Amino acid sequence: MTSRVDTVDNAASTPDHPQPFAELGLKDDEYARIREILGRRPTDAELAMYSVMWSEHCSYKSSKVHLRYFGQTTTEEMRSAMLAGIGENAGVVDIGDGWAVTFKVESHNHPSYVEPYQGAATGVGGIVRDIMAMGARPIAVMDQLRFGAADAPDTRRVFDGVVRGIGGYGNSLGLPNIGGETVFDASYAGNPLVNALCAGVLRKEDLHLAFASGAGNKIILFGARTGLDGIGGVSVLASETFGGDEADGASRKKLPSVQVGDPFTEKVLIECCLELYAAHLVVGIQDLGGAGLSCATSELASAGDGGMHIDLDKVPLRATGMTPAEVLSSESQERMCAVVTPENVDAFMAVCRKWDVLATVIGEVTDGDRLRITWHGETVVDVPPRTVAHEGPVYQRPVARPDTQDALIADTAGGLARPASAAELRQTLLDMIGSPHLCSRAFITEQYDRYVRGNTVLAEHADSGVIRVDEQTGRGIALATDASGRYTLLDPYRGAQLALAEAYRNVAASGATPVAVTNCLNFGSPEDPGVMWQFSEAVRGLADGCVTLGIPVTGGNVSFYNQTGTTPILPTPVVGVLGVIDDVNRRIPTGFGTEPGETLILLGDTADEFDGSIWAQVAHDHLGGTPPKVDLAREQLLAQVLTAASRDGLVSAAHDLSEGGLIQAVVESALAGETGCRLLLPEGADPFVALFSESAGRVLVAVPRTEESRFMSMCEARQLPAVRIGVVDQGSDSVEVQGQFSVTLAELREIHEGVLPGLFG
């Protein structure tokens, strides 16, 4: 042991020793509470543990009082298919035939601004390990990305690094990236959002949970060695404040606060874990992500039926001279912590050797209720684990509707100049699809492997992705993620429901039945009452919406302090929806022209709704008014029609309507199918409203002419509005709006696909 180590005995004998708790993010009263819990001052290692585990990121101390609403509103019927939910590493849902799917979305926002490549890459790696920790094989990833204005000076640096990081890590893991969403807005300058979703598949009986039980069971750390990367994010942990000479402290301050990922280590770690699960060698397991060993040990111990002893000096290190505080707080990637019975340790180690994965017994489960950590024989941590992992501070932050909200709502898009001629309508279309907001994302998705492993059935950016789960039966899943910061700023409750509705609709448009929800709630500072009002309203909106739709929230993530200076980002609740499809061969594609002779039918009602729209932003740089109405009962009906139509082969293509309205969906489906079409707008309809309205609850479908009558009868029987608006012209080279304008596919493709390469290529 070196002289710089602060032991429990030393802490007890030096009660007045000054400690840098404020620099570590702890408030005066939080530090006082730690002293009260321990009956003494904490050691440096204990202070490190409490500071990271009581952080906003780990403890949810500002959001917990609001997040409880999800549990309060979830009915037993909604929970019926849920095998694991909020509080676990990821939600798990029974999808039938003995299969289960686990999925979750998490943020890696701040690291992705500091070091975009590694921030995004380790964001993917972290969420993949969450899925692995449930006993599942990861099968797909998606991403929700937000950047500053596309032409802003720093956007290129962040965009390039994030996209390369996601692709570099995911491609190396052999995981298909099956969709997502990319948005550019000035509010995200200096604070990009990188939200990564991963889904995994397992047999129901193979589910694993994070807990340590059975006195005498061994704690095994396996995967990469532990280094100093990731520590800078918790301020002075790597500095001389914890002892050591000035030169050593100065050098450590230069270490990266962003973790460094190695996807090839994670790839063998995945296979190693799956073999360990198959051999039934694991009692409990936890991945090491945020807060590292501090989190893994305290969460495993507090979720079990005993205590835990850890010999911290047995942790394999890749840096010399690390202190206990640094070892506990390191966020080095590609590490897992397992609970293993003594008789299975040798077999566990043999599997790890087979995969060339480093594994070390670092401790054991004990009787009692203490987490005790030693360093070269001396105790540096002796705490009740629940006080670290689950009993941190909980705040009821002030909540206040902003004084500016009424003025924002009053500033509607109603008075904005609209295109008044056919030529102006045509130019509006070209301006919209040629803007960074609605242009093609192919420049991004081409950097991702969407079809690796051979089970990807559908992978359309901004729509749902479909993955085959069972090769024999064709059973599969659909996933979609959506968010609208613009709508949520105008009305947080409705904005969250619109995001839910769009993700739900995207899943249904593929032919799948939506069954469960995950979320990642990205907001500004919780110390701002206006931000907390946005947050609380968004949580209520999402929870109430799930009740109406009858599907549960299985888990999620909260990311606060997303702001530049005192200016917060647009409030961005990202919603992910999981759907189940009995036979992926019946999935509905996006592109026109899969069947000869198709009629285009618009499902749902169109209203004059342009507040918060992309048209208002592109044409007038305007944001104000009230978002489109949301009718979740109608969304449910729409989904039922689409899944029935998919099953019966009545629909050959489908595309939800959202940003950019009908004409945006038409252009994307025409380009996807490489075939033109003719639109005939309803008699008396305002062409601008018909083409560009962003009314929710609508889907454009292509129906084989032989099935048109049957499909329309189905819609009529279910009282779902459906109107014929055109035909697909196979062999045609243009999109024509009869009586208004025509644009060739070549011109549309050139404009639509040239924007991002021009900006970032």
Curated annotation (Swiss-Prot):
GO terms for molecular function: ATP binding; magnesium ion binding; phosphoribosylformylglycinamidine synthase activity. One of its GO terms (cellular component) is cytoplasm. Its EC number is 6.3.5.3. The keyword Oxidoreductase does not apply. Substrate binds at S107, H108, N109, H110, R129, Q259, E331, S332, Q333, S559. Residues 1-23 are annotated as: Disordered. Pathway: Purine metabolism; IMP biosynthesis via de novo pathway; 5-amino-1-(5-phospho-D-ribosyl)imidazole from N(2)-formyl-N(1)-(5-phospho-D-ribosyl)glycinamide: step 1/2. It is found in: Cytoplasm. It catalyses: N(2)-formyl-N(1)-(5-phospho-beta-D-ribosyl)glycinamide + L-glutamine + ATP + H2O = 2-formamido-N(1)-(5-O-phospho-beta-D-ribosyl)acetamidine + L-glutamate + ADP + phosphate + H(+). Mg(2+) 1 binds at E106, N557. Belongs to the FGAMS family. PANTHER family: PHOSPHORIBOSYLFORMYLGLYCINAMIDINE SYNTHASE SUBUNIT PURL (PTHR43555:SF1). Part of the phosphoribosylformylglycinamidine synthase complex involved in the purines biosynthetic pathway. Catalyzes the ATP-dependent conversion of formylglycinamide ribonucleotide (FGAR) and glutamine to yield formylglycinamidine ribonucleotide (FGAM) and glutamate. The FGAM synthase complex is composed of three subunits. PurQ produces an ammonia molecule by converting glutamine to glutamate. PurL transfers the ammonia molecule to FGAR to form FGAM in an ATP-dependent manner. This is Phosphoribosylformylglycinamidine synthase subunit PurL. It comes from Mycobacteroides abscessus (strain ATCC 19977 / DSM 44196 / CCUG 20993 / CIP 104536 / JCM 13569 / NCTC 13031 / TMC 1543 / L948). The lineage of its organism: Bacteria, Bacillati, Actinomycetota, Actinomycetes, Mycobacteriales. The gene is purL.
